[in-house]
């Protein structure tokens, strides 16, 4: 998949290293970028004036339009990067899509050299953009009466990031199935896409392609591979009209489509990092407050000594004090009543509303007590 920076970092670094070397160095480097873009750089001491750069893209398309080779228009754009500097090698290196021969002697010195090398490092961005441009042009000028032209085109620039383009009346729709590994990223992405749709519907964004999000795939994608239609973050669609692919707008539209996956993932990762930083900062603030509170309590204990514990022992909470008073009052009433017991069953004996007192027993003998006779 294309990325936010047009220039390949590894390709640019290697070419600058070869260009700035005081003596020719042997270079035979083979590397991949983003899983689908392949490069090979060959520089030999025996031929110090020529650097061979080969590149290839995993371009898979299914549908009404299929591009397997680089067009003549793309060749002209590549040659115009540096007139007299770039030669296209025919046939290309085995297993690659394009091979360029760079003449180091024809590269101008100073800042212009860095500019040309940077443009050469944008080779894959130029190829990918040109291929997608031709697809959009071919779809735009097709006849709507032919039903086969409305079939979706599956475009794969990265094995795990395919997207679809299909023709509709007066517009072209690009659909991006979105998948994320982390559950937190899924939550952030879902909220982000819904917010994107809401912002895109405002009047200020009337010139931009209309954006829509749905948790289920569009009807036009029926019959496509199940792995593409199984997502955890839904499907994002952009409606591209004829005004978006006219003149210089075509370059911007194509580049935005190629970089949508990269932009979305970049935004979500940044949002996740921001949330984590805020949570960490909040946690540090709470811990600091707790530490300050414990330090203040220890300082107060050291100043007051034992007085604090005496005050705490004497001080009684208001609720407990009221309960204690009620208990005292109840005890006083019980003592006054002399343990009188009310018997409701004696009402028929005219003892209604009367009280029977329990006799008092004493362990000391009295004068009225009985004496056992011998």
UniProtKB/Swiss-Prot annotation:
<dbReference type="GO" id="GO:0005737">
    <property type="term" value="C:cytoplasm"/>
</dbReference>
<dbReference type="GO" id="GO:0007015">
    <property type="term" value="P:actin filament organization"/>
</dbReference>
<comment type="function">
    <text>Functions as actin-binding component of the Arp2/3 complex which is involved in regulation of actin polymerization and together with an activating nucleation-promoting factor (NPF) mediates the formation of branched actin networks. Seems to contact the mother actin filament. Arp2/3 complex plays a critical role in the control of cell morphogenesis via the modulation of cell polarity development.</text>
</comment>
<keyword id="KW-0009">Actin-binding</keyword>
<dbReference type="GO" id="GO:0030041">
    <property type="term" value="P:actin filament polymerization"/>
</dbReference>
<dbReference type="InterPro" id="IPR007188">
    <property type="entry name" value="ARPC2"/>
</dbReference>
<dbReference type="GO" id="GO:0042995">
    <property type="term" value="C:cell projection"/>
</dbReference>
<dbReference type="Pfam" id="PF04045">
    <property type="entry name" value="P34-Arc"/>
</dbReference>
<comment type="similarity">
    <text>Belongs to the ARPC2 family.</text>
</comment>
<dbReference type="GO" id="GO:0005885">
    <property type="term" value="C:Arp2/3 protein complex"/>
</dbReference>
<comment type="subunit">
    <text>Component of the Arp2/3 complex composed of ARP2, ARP3, ARPC1/p41-ARC, ARPC2/p34-ARC, ARPC3/p21-ARC, ARPC4/p20-ARC and ARPC5/p16-ARC.</text>
</comment>
<keyword id="KW-0206">Cytoskeleton</keyword>
<keyword id="KW-0966">Cell projection</keyword>
<dbReference type="GO" id="GO:0034314">
    <property type="term" value="P:Arp2/3 complex-mediated actin nucleation"/>
</dbReference>
<protein>
    <recommendedName>
        <fullName>Actin-related protein 2/3 complex subunit 2B</fullName>
    </recommendedName>
</protein>
<keyword id="KW-0963">Cytoplasm</keyword>
<dbReference type="GO" id="GO:0003779">
    <property type="term" value="F:actin binding"/>
</dbReference>
<dbReference type="InterPro" id="IPR034666">
    <property type="entry name" value="ARPC2/4"/>
</dbReference>
């Amino acid at each position: 998949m294309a990325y936010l920076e047009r220039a390949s970092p590894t390709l640019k670094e290697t070419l600058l290293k070869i260009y700035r070397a005081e003596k020719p160095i042997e270079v035979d480097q083979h590397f991949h970028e983003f899983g689908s873009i392949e490069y090979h750089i060959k520089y030999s001491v025996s031929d110090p004036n020529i650097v061979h750069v080969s590149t290839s893209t995993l371009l898979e398309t299914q549908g009404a339009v299929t591009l397997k080779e680089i067009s003549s228009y793309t060749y002209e754009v590549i040659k115009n990067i540096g007139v007299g500097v770039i030669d296209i090698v025919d046939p290309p290196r085995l297993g690659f899509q394009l091979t360029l021969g760079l003449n180091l002697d024809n590269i101008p010195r100073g800042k212009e050299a860095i500019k040309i090398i940077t443009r050469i490092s944008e080779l894959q961005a130029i190829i990918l953009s040109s291929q997608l441009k031709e697809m959009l042009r071919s779809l735009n000028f097709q006849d709507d009466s032919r039903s086969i032209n409305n079939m979706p085109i599956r475009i794969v620039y990265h094995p795990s990031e395919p997207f679809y383009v299909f023709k509709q009346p007066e517009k072209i729709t690009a659909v991006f199935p979105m998948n994320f590994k982390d559950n937190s990223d899924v939550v952030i992405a879902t909220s982000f896409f819904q917010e994107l749709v809401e912002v895109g519907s405002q009047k200020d964004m009337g010139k931009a392609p209309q954006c829509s999000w749905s948790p289920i795939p569009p009807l036009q994608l029926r019959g496509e591979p199940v792995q593409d239609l199984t997502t955890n973050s839904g499907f994002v669609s952009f409606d591209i009209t004829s005004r978006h692919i006219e003149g210089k707008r075509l370059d911007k539209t194509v580049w935005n489509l190629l970089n949508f996956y990269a932009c979305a993932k970049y935004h979500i990762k940044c949002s996740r990092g921001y949330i984590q930083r805020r949570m960490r900062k909040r946690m540090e603030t709470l811990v600091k407050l707790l530490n300050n509170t414990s330090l203040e309590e220890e300082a107060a204990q050291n100043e007051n000594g034992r007085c604090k514990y005496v005050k705490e022992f004497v001080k009684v909470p208001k609720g407990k004090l009221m309960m204690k008073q009620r208990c005292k009052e109840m005890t006083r009433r019980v003592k006054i009543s002399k343990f009188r017991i009310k018997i409701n069953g004696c009402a028929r004996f005219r003892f209604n509303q009367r009280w029977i007192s329990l006799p008092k027993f004493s362990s000391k003998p009295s004068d009225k007590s009985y004496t056992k006779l011998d």
